[in-house]
UniProtKB/Swiss-Prot annotation:
NCBIfam families: L18_bact. The keyword Ribosomal protein applies. GO terms for biological process: translation. This is Large ribosomal subunit protein uL18. Part of the 50S ribosomal subunit; part of the 5S rRNA/L5/L18/L25 subcomplex. Contacts the 5S and 23S rRNAs. Transmembrane segments: none annotated. GO terms for molecular function: 5S rRNA binding; structural constituent of ribosome.
Length: 115
Protein backbone atom coordinates (compact mmCIF):
# COMPACT_ATOMS: atom_id res chain seq x y z
CA UNK A 1 0.00 0.00 0.00
CA UNK A 2 1.45 3.37 -0.96
CA UNK A 3 1.89 6.22 1.51
CA UNK A 4 -0.84 8.27 -0.16
CA UNK A 5 -3.32 5.38 0.01
CA UNK A 6 -2.55 4.95 3.72
CA UNK A 7 -3.14 8.67 4.26
CA UNK A 8 -6.47 8.49 2.45
CA UNK A 9 -7.50 5.47 4.53
CA UNK A 10 -6.76 7.37 7.75
CA UNK A 11 -8.65 10.40 6.43
CA UNK A 12 -11.70 8.30 5.58
CA UNK A 13 -11.87 6.91 9.13
CA UNK A 14 -11.68 10.37 10.67
CA UNK A 15 -14.31 11.80 8.33
CA UNK A 16 -16.74 9.02 9.22
CA UNK A 17 -16.26 9.76 12.93
CA UNK A 18 -16.81 13.50 12.37
CA UNK A 19 -19.95 12.73 10.38
CA UNK A 20 -21.27 10.75 13.37
CA UNK A 21 -20.59 13.71 15.67
CA UNK A 22 -22.51 16.07 13.39
CA UNK A 23 -20.26 19.12 13.77
CA UNK A 24 -18.88 21.33 11.02
CA UNK A 25 -15.34 20.38 10.04
CA UNK A 26 -12.20 22.28 9.17
CA UNK A 27 -10.54 20.34 6.32
CA UNK A 28 -6.87 20.86 5.54
CA UNK A 29 -5.08 19.96 2.32
CA UNK A 30 -1.41 20.56 1.69
CA UNK A 31 0.80 20.38 -1.34
CA UNK A 32 4.50 21.20 -1.51
CA UNK A 33 3.66 24.73 -2.75
CA UNK A 34 0.34 25.62 -1.12
CA UNK A 35 -1.98 25.12 1.86
CA UNK A 36 -5.76 24.96 1.58
CA UNK A 37 -8.38 25.04 4.34
CA UNK A 38 -12.14 24.94 4.17
CA UNK A 39 -14.97 24.69 6.66
CA UNK A 40 -17.69 22.32 5.49
CA UNK A 41 -20.90 20.98 6.97
CA UNK A 42 -20.64 17.68 8.83
CA UNK A 43 -21.78 15.63 5.86
CA UNK A 44 -19.54 17.58 3.46
CA UNK A 45 -22.38 18.74 1.26
CA UNK A 46 -21.76 22.48 1.60
CA UNK A 47 -18.63 24.62 1.94
CA UNK A 48 -19.11 27.39 4.49
CA UNK A 49 -15.72 29.18 4.37
CA UNK A 50 -12.43 28.80 2.50
CA UNK A 51 -8.88 30.12 2.68
CA UNK A 52 -5.65 29.20 0.94
CA UNK A 53 -2.25 30.54 0.04
CA UNK A 54 -3.69 31.31 -3.40
CA UNK A 55 -5.86 34.11 -1.94
CA UNK A 56 -4.84 37.60 -3.01
CA UNK A 57 -3.93 38.60 0.55
CA UNK A 58 -1.51 35.69 0.97
CA UNK A 59 -0.15 35.11 -2.53
CA UNK A 60 2.59 37.76 -2.28
CA UNK A 61 5.06 35.95 0.02
CA UNK A 62 6.24 32.37 0.28
CA UNK A 63 3.32 29.95 0.11
CA UNK A 64 4.70 26.55 1.13
CA UNK A 65 6.10 27.19 4.59
CA UNK A 66 4.96 27.34 8.22
CA UNK A 67 4.47 31.12 8.19
CA UNK A 68 2.10 30.87 5.24
CA UNK A 69 0.18 28.10 7.02
CA UNK A 70 -0.23 30.36 10.06
CA UNK A 71 -1.68 33.10 7.88
CA UNK A 72 -4.11 30.63 6.29
CA UNK A 73 -5.18 29.52 9.78
CA UNK A 74 -5.87 33.09 10.86
CA UNK A 75 -7.79 33.83 7.66
CA UNK A 76 -9.97 30.70 7.84
CA UNK A 77 -10.83 31.48 11.47
CA UNK A 78 -11.86 35.03 10.57
CA UNK A 79 -14.00 33.84 7.66
CA UNK A 80 -15.61 31.06 9.68
CA UNK A 81 -16.49 33.46 12.49
CA UNK A 82 -17.95 35.86 9.92
CA UNK A 83 -20.14 32.99 8.69
CA UNK A 84 -21.34 32.39 12.27
CA UNK A 85 -19.25 29.30 13.02
CA UNK A 86 -17.51 29.12 16.39
CA UNK A 87 -16.83 25.40 16.87
CA UNK A 88 -15.50 22.88 14.33
CA UNK A 89 -13.90 19.44 14.21
CA UNK A 90 -10.36 19.45 12.82
CA UNK A 91 -9.92 17.15 9.81
CA UNK A 92 -6.21 16.90 9.03
CA UNK A 93 -6.91 14.67 6.00
CA UNK A 94 -4.57 11.92 7.20
CA UNK A 95 -1.54 14.22 7.42
CA UNK A 96 0.61 14.10 10.55
CA UNK A 97 -0.17 16.81 13.10
CA UNK A 98 3.22 18.39 12.58
CA UNK A 99 4.77 21.36 10.82
CA UNK A 100 2.41 23.23 8.50
CA UNK A 101 -0.72 21.34 9.59
CA UNK A 102 0.00 22.08 13.24
CA UNK A 103 0.80 25.74 12.49
CA UNK A 104 -2.52 26.19 10.67
CA UNK A 105 -4.46 24.58 13.54
CA UNK A 106 -2.71 26.64 16.23
CA UNK A 107 -3.26 29.89 14.34
CA UNK A 108 -6.96 29.10 13.87
CA UNK A 109 -7.29 28.39 17.60
CA UNK A 110 -5.54 31.63 18.52
CA UNK A 111 -7.87 33.54 16.20
CA UNK A 112 -10.88 32.23 18.13
CA UNK A 113 -11.99 29.03 16.40
CA UNK A 114 -12.70 26.17 18.82
CA UNK A 115 -11.99 22.49 18.12
Amino acid sequence: MSANNERLRRARKVRMKIRELGTDRLCVHRTPRHMYAQVTTADGSKVLATASTLDKELRQGATGNVDAAKKVGQLIAERAKAAGIEKVAFDRSGYRYHGRVQALADAAREAGLQF
